[in-house]
């Protein structure tokens, strides 16, 4: 049986932080929904600095789709001013079973 990486291409992991009007606008809920639709795993949470941060893992193409969504779409009432992606790397296995909101 082929593992997920061989079946779907390289597995990637990336950390992100979204700046702008991203708290109090259901950004985390929409992020969790989009991640589940795309089939990526990881987490999302609000920060004390007024940003939203998290991590996404999955097949490279799906992680790239999630990065694009985080950069340009977000929740309907959000305003994304900037997003920083950090520690993007290839991984051998997923570290999460699903996508969740952290508090």
Swiss-Prot record:
This is Acylphosphatase-2. InterPro entries: Acylphosphatase (IPR020456), Acylphosphatase-like_dom (IPR001792), Acylphosphatase-like_dom_sf (IPR036046), Acylphosphatase_CS (IPR017968). It comes from the Eukaryota. Its EC number is 3.6.1.7. Gene3D superfamilies: 3.30.70.100. It catalyses: an acyl phosphate + H2O = a carboxylate + phosphate + H(+). The active site is at residues 28, 46. Residues 13-103 form the Acylphosphatase-like domain. PROSITE patterns: ACYLPHOSPHATASE_1 (PS00150), ACYLPHOSPHATASE_2 (PS00151), ACYLPHOSPHATASE_3 (PS51160). It holds the Pfam family Acylphosphatase. The keyword Hydrolase applies. Keywords: Hydrolase. PANTHER family: ACYLPHOSPHATASE, ACYLPHOSPHATASE-2. Belongs to the acylphosphatase family. One of its GO terms (molecular function) is acylphosphatase activity. The keyword Hydrolase applies. The lineage of its organism: Eukaryota, Metazoa, Chordata, Craniata, Vertebrata. It is an enzyme of class 3 (hydrolase).
């Amino acid at each position: 049986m082929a593992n997920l990486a061989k079946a779907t291409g390289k597995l990637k992991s990336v950390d992100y932080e979204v700046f702008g009007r991203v708290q109090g606008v259901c950004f985390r809920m929409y992020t969790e929904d989009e991640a589940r639709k795309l089939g990526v795993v990881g987490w999302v949470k609000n920060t004390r600095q007024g940003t939203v941060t998290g991590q996404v893992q999955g097949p490279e193409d799906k992680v790239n789709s999630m990065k694009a969504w985080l950069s340009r779409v977000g929740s309907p009432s959000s305003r994304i001013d900037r997003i920083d992606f950090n520690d993007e790397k290839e991984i051998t296995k997923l570290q999460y079973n699903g996508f969740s909101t952290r508090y």
